[in-house]
Amino acid sequence: MPRNLVLFDLEWNIGYKPFTFNYHGVQQTLRGEIIEIGAVKIDEDANVLDTFSIHLRPRIFRSLQHHIAKVTGLTQEDLDKGEPILQGLRRFMKWCGPDAEFAEWGLDDVPVLKQNLFLCNLDESRPTVWYDLQQIFLREHPRKEGEGMKLESVVTRMGIPMERPFHDALSDTLYTCLLYT
């Protein structure tokens, strides 16, 4: 088990029109611009040592896409009041520390994090190691026919009390932490 394990979740906004950029000589489409980060540092027994939560103000996709608003419950005002994305990402990566290994439910968020770090001219070489906790969970709890793998479905299946809203980055991270234990 890594000494500095950070479980995290991102909520990201998408544009009404695609945004393409040159990423190390390759044209890429931005998958999403981060608008919320939730993270926990855990010890080897999966006890929560510290939490991190922040709303970010995007630079590229400034208008909150209606589907994202519906899913997350965030408003345009939440985005407008968020910490500027550059400062927020810098603060998050500093909180994680240089030796952090990341874990998430699925593998969607690390590529989005790396794209956003790059677009903010921040070091996107970290994390160098990250884990897909969904796959680790499946080894212990094989999926049955018709069972969904969305976080909410798995939390329900495992009988974990749903005391926090889903699609809130910190809440989703804390649910993931409960599944990890």
Language-model regions, residue ranges each:
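Conserved small/polar residues in nucleotide/adenosyl-binding loops
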Residues: 180-181
